[in-house]
Amino acid sequence: MASDLEQLCSYVNEKIENIKKILSLRKLGQDPTLKTTLSKIGDEIITVNELLNQFELEIQYQEQTNSSLKELCKSLEEEFKDVEHLKEHIPSHLPQVTVTQSSTHKPDLDPKESVKAEEPVLPKKPPKEQRVIKEMHFITTDEFSGVPAYMKSRLTYCQINDVIKEINKAVVSKYKIIHQPKASMSSVKRNLYQRFINEETKDTKGRHFIVEADIKEFTTLKVDKKFHVIMNILRHCQRLSEVRGGGLTRYVIT
């Protein structure tokens, strides 16, 4: 019983001490000479909080980079093993490469062979002209520094260029389908091709563009608030322009 009373008294005394501390701190807050100091402390706390958020974003980016590098190393190791295996198991029946030395005396040619040698060589057909797919250029550090702070918020230079990389992936995937012969298309690609054509307007003729559906189709990016903030930054840096119409926003590569 005495032990319980002692614990209760100790608990009550602790609460009283806490109340006294709170009251003393409250009085400090009302002191005009300390208000400026407390305000500065509050500002510093906000600044530290923002720095912690930036550190958190940077740590996430470094973790993603580390994961990608591990996957790359694993892939390279597997390819190296395959090369070593091929090197050790070259089939013996393959012909050996022989180096022939040029002779100063040309052997006599058979008349029939000389006639063949004199026949004109038909010109080769010129290769088909490859269509160039326009991709977005990465932003530079100077351009990133020139973006207003309110626009880029806590985004980093690397995060923006990572999005550009994904946008280029979507652009290349889309226009490879458009340039592909229709006869060789699967039903899925035919449907995509038809959508691409339907999204064209007179303002996008001859220009490369994508819509949000292409981002979802060809990349792992999330079309969220962060994505739209980055698109605004890219428009500010003159990497793209927008053409609206028919309920769609077309992001045109500039």
Curated annotation (Swiss-Prot):
CDD domains: SKA1_N
GO biological process terms, semicolon-separated: attachment of mitotic spindle microtubules to kinetochore; cell division; chromosome segregation; establishment of meiotic spindle orientation; metaphase chromosome alignment; mitotic cell cycle; mitotic metaphase chromosome alignment; mitotic sister chromatid segregation
PTM-bearing positions, type Phosphothreonine: T156
Top-level division of the source organism's lineage: Eukaryota
Modified residues (Phosphoserine): S241
Keywords: Cell cycle, Cell division, Centromere, Chromosome, Coiled coil, Cytoplasm, Cytoskeleton, Kinetochore, Microtubule, Mitosis, Phosphoprotein
Gene3D superfamilies according to UniProt: 6.10.250.1370, Ska1 microtubule binding domain-like
Residue segments, region Disordered: 97-127
Stretch list, region Binds microtubules and protein phosphatase PP1 subunit PPP1CA: 131-254
Spans annotated as Flexiple loop that anchors MAPRE1: 91-131
Compartment(s) of residence: Cytoplasm, Cytoskeleton, Spindle; Chromosome, Centromere, Kinetochore; Cytoplasm, Cytoskeleton, Microtubule organizing center, Centrosome
Family matches, as InterPro entries: SKA1, SKA1_MBD_sf
GO CC term (a single one): nucleoplasm
Short motif (SXLP motif): ranges: 92-95
Biased composition (Basic and acidic residues): 105-127
Ranges in a coiled coil: 58-90
GO molecular function: microtubule binding
Pfam entry (one): SKA1
Subunit structure: Component of the SKA complex, composed of SKA1, SKA2 and SKA3. The SKA complex is a homodimer organized around a central W-shaped coiled-coil structure, formed by the interacting domains of SKA1, SKA2, and SKA3, each end of the 'W' is extended further by the C-terminal microtubule-binding domains of SKA1 and SKA3; the complex forms extended structures on microtubules. Interacts (via SXLP motif) with MAPRE1 (via C-terminus); the interaction is direct and stabilizes the kinetochore-microtubule attachment of the SKA1 complex.
Protein family (similarity comment): Belongs to the SKA1 family.
Role, per record: Component of the SKA complex, a microtubule plus end-binding complex of the outer kinetochore that stabilizes spindle microtubule-kinetochore attachments, promotes alignment of chromosomes at the mitotic spindle equator (chromosome congression) and assists suppression of the spindle assembly checkpoint. Kinetochores, consisting of a centromere-associated inner segment and a microtubule-contacting outer segment, play a crucial role in chromosome segregation by mediating the physical connection between centromeric DNA and spindle microtubules.
Record protein name field: SKA complex subunit 1
